[in-house]
């Protein structure tokens, strides 16, 4: 074992320190750039207390560009390797993704894209952070000016409380309380193909306890459950639900 005092395993050599866990804050995009996977493996084996919080925040490339975040392919690759290493050491560990709605640049179509991504990958977030402006961030600059300060091009900003509610509801499309908002959002975006009982539909044809809506799209019979599998379909995550704490206050990304 290397003897560098800065190596991750050095933490385990400190007298009186039994465990050191990283709950969040990992820059997974930087981690993927390291050709040496020893830190990644150390992290998974010794420094995760059941679940690790990471921040893909969105899946739309246009929105992620405004956030200054890597594209979703980086998160997918991180997830794949995380669960591969977890399986190799025979542990049951989870990823808890931070997600954000209504960030400057996020239109209704982007929120629908994210909802479809979550459904496809069996992710059901218990908490979603709606964007709100805080001083000193590029995102806040875009929120108030409706301009990208780097290009001076116009940026769409959802400021109306109802428009923001539509985007937020889509990220929790599976919650019956969000049915009316999701239905309105999908109709407004002309995506009635996502209303029905088909495997790709986000919401059923009828609201809970209501009548079927013959304007909906999906035709396949049966319903789809979300199993909470990791991105990429790794069956290491067997469907047990990890209990998640509220995200707290998250704001626009600082540059």
What feature does the model see in each segment?
Residues 30-33, 57-69, 89-110, 122-162:
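Flexible glycine/acidic-rich beta-alpha junction loops that bind and position SAM and/or redox cofactors
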Residues 1-96, 100-104:
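Conserved SAM/AdoMet-binding glycine-rich loop
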């Amino acid at each position: 074992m290397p003897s560098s005092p800065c190596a991750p395993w050095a933490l385990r050599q400190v007298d009186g320190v039994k465990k050191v866990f990283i709950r969040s804050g990992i820059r997974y995009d930087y981690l993927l750039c390291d050709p040496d996977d020893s830190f990644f493996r150390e992290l998974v084996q010794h420094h995760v207390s059941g679940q690790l919080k990471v921040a893909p925040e969105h899946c739309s490339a246009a929105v992620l560009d405004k956030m200054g975040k890597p594209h979703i392919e980086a998160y997918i690759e991180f997830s794949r390797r995380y669960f591969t290493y977890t399986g190799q050491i025979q542990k049951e560990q989870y990823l808890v993704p931070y997600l954000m709605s209504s960030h400057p640049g996020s239109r209704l179509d982007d929120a629908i894209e994210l909802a479809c991504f979550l459904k496809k990958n069996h992710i059901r977030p218990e908490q979603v952070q709606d964007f709100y402006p805080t001083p000193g961030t590029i995102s806040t600059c875009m929120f108030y000016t409706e301009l990208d300060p780097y290009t001076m091009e116009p940026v769409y900003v959802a400021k109306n409380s109802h428009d923001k509610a539509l985007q937020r509801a889509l990220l929790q499309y599976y919650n019956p309380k969000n049915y009316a908002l999701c239905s309105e959002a999908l109709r407004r975006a002309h995506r009635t193909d996502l209303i029905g009982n088909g495997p790709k539909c986000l919401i059923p044809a009828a609201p809970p306890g209501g009548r079927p809506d013959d304007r909906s799209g999906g035709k396949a019979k049966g319903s789809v459950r979300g199993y909470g599998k990791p991105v990429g379909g790794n069956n290491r995550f067997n469907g047990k639900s990890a209990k998640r704490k509220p995200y707290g206050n998250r704001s626009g990304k600082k540059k």
